[in-house]
């Protein structure tokens, strides 16, 4: 009685402001968080407001592909 696909998947969240700002200048790094999401409840891209240690503020972290 195995189900086809897992409901919970592991996703990587990346800071959107670090990605935008690192094009112009040398960046110290890009903030990334690893979390899980329920595929049935949130089928589209995941976005959370998390703390970015490189920007020193809370920014929107968006889901990226592995």
UniProtKB/Swiss-Prot annotation:
Q: Which GO terms describe its molecular function?
A: structural constituent of ribosome
Localized where? Plastid, Chloroplast
Alphabetized, the UniProt keywords read:
Chloroplast, Plastid, Ribonucleoprotein, Ribosomal protein
InterPro entries per the UniProt record, alphabetical: Ribosomal_bL33 (IPR001705), Ribosomal_bL33_CS (IPR018264), Ribosomal_bL33_sf (IPR038584), Ribosomal_zn-bd (IPR011332)
Q: Which biological process annotations from GO are given for this protein? A: translation
A Pfam family annotated for this UniProt entry: Ribosomal_L33
Q: What family, per the record?
A: Belongs to the bacterial ribosomal protein bL33 family.
Q: What is this protein called?
A: Large ribosomal subunit protein bL33c
């Amino acid at each position: 009685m195995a189900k086809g696909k897992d409901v919970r998947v592991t996703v990587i969240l990346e800071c959107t402001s670090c990605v935008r700002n690192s094009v112009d200048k040398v960046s110290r790094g890009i903030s990334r968080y690893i979390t899980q999401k329920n595929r049935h409840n949130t089928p589209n891209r995941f976005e959370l407001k998390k703390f970015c240690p490189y920007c020193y503020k809370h920014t929107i972290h968006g889901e990226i592909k592995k």
